[in-house]
């Protein structure tokens, strides 16, 4: 769920004009080496911000989160500190971020209550980007065709679910 805070920070950067959807960001070795769910990025890639948004939402890309963090703040550590600060300003009093992806780490916590607050802020503060959360697949460069589908099983149940994260 930490990825939602990373997206909040990225949507804010878009609204402030610090990046655009077509801005390309470099991929570091740290991002390439990230484990878990990824976009399969490598150091030769320069994905656009829009591709990174889709990679985080649809593919749950941990590597994409690091690219965003480094692109906006220089380092993932600096970005995580900014996530916590911004979260406090939004009312997230029970969450502390130590990385951009939510990868298990000591001191990294997010409460269900704070998740609800953040979800509401995402929908209300950035309605123009909400459409990304309803995407059911993202075949990024056809790198892993079997990995292109959204990990949110609620999207395909026909119950009216239209997004955010699982």
Residue ranges and their predicted role:
Residues 1-25, 115:
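Active-site SXXK
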Residues 1-5, 43-51, 55-62, 73-81, ...:
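Soluble non-cytosolic domains of exported or imported proteins
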Residues 12-16, 71, 121:
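Active-site catalytic microenvironments for nucleophilic, acid-base chemistry
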Residues 16-39, 134-143:
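Short, glycine/proline-biased beta-turn/loop segments that scaffold the active-site neighborhood
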Residues 28-30, 57-60, 68-69, 98-101, ...:
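Active-site-proximal beta-strand/loop segments in catalytic clefts of secreted hydrolases
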Residues 32-65, 148-164:
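Conserved catalytic neighborhood of penicillin-recognizing serine enzymes
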Residues 32-38, 66-67, 95-105:
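Surface-exposed aromatic
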Residues 75-166:
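Penicillin-recognizing serine hydrolase domain
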């Amino acid at each position: 769920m930490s990825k939602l805070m990373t997206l909040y920070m990225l949507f804010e950067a878009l609204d402030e004009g610090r990046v655009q959807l077509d801005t390309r960001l470099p991929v570091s070795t740290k991002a390439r080496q990230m484990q878990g769910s990824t976009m399969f990025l490598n150091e030769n890639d320069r994905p656009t911000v829009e591709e990174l948004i889709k990679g985080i939402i649809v593919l749950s890309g941990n590597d994409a989160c690091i690219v965003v963090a480094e692109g906006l703040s220089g380092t993932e550590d600096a970005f995580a500190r900014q996530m916590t600060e911004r979260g406090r300003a939004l009312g997230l009093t029970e969450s502390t971020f130590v990385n951009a992806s939510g990868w298990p780490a000591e001191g990294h916590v997010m409460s269900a209550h704070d998740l609800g607050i953040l979800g509401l802020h995402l929908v209300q503060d950035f309605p123009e980007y909400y459409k990304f959360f309803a995407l059911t697949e993202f075949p990024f460069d056809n790198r892993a065709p079997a990995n292109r589908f959204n990990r949110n099983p609620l999207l395909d149940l026909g119950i009216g679910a239209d997004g955010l994260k699982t």
